[in-house]
Amino acid sequence: MKIEDWRNKELEKLYVNVFILEEETYVRIKEEIKKQKIYIFIGLNLKGYKEIIGVYTPEEETTGYWIQEIANFKSRGIEDIFMICMINNKWIKKVIKMNYPEVIMAPSMIEIYNKTRKYISNKDHRIVMRELGRVYRALTLEEAKVVYNNLVNEYKENKLIIQIINKYIDDIFRLFKYSHHARVITGNSGNYNRMRNNISSKIKKVGLFESIKELKYYLNEILKEEESKWKPSVKRWDKIINEMDCNLSEKILDLI
């Protein structure tokens, strides 16, 4: 399978979650070394299996670029998406909402981890991420707010850490109108973290690619290897899918 094959293969009608992995690397283009964004879209289907549904290396990231690529999802079969797990990207977010207006936008703990670790000491970063994870997995909003308030109180003298926490907390709190299971499957699991770290470390291992073609070939090889290892994403999947929110059930019925 080539990168283009992932962008053209037939897809399922409904995905419970689409996890967007964002990476950066460097590519030599006409004797210049340029930063290159990589986006890997991974879908979680109704049977609890992950699959790569698209790999993108935009030369220039614009709304127009993503309008073309996300519209391609519909032509390949995706009629609805229950939840998207991503870091905030204004282009992708806008275009996905245009095509799938009822989708739930969930902040990705894995991407928050990677976006923030360079700005906080290792010790504090472990604590902040552990406690944000507890907020995300809390059974009720009230329980989540207790964990959040304790965390903010612990770091009340550190303005940077408080700003980082508050940048994401409202998006996490908004998810509490959905079931506990709907929140937990949005990319917080150890399986997703290992998957993300495996892909990230292999990309960083190269550092500089001599061309976009070389980058695409390398991505093709490492993603084929990674995808071959994937098993059902969540244990007791049948029980979880039965306890998901009623609006997921409505989406399924609409497609039957």
Kindly give the residue locations of the regions a language model identified.
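Tryptophan-centered motif/residue detector
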Residues: 6-9, 66, 183, 218, ...
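RNase H-like nuclease fold core
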Residues: 1-85, 191-192
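Extended amphipathic alpha-helical interaction segments
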Residues: 95-191, 195, 201-209, 226-227
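Short, well-ordered alpha-helical microsegments
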Residues: 89-94
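Structured, non-transmembrane catalytic/binding cores
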Residues: 17, 110, 127-135, 162-168, ...
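Basic, amphipathic alpha-helical segments enriched in Lys/Arg and hydrophobic/aromatic residues
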Residues: 197-256
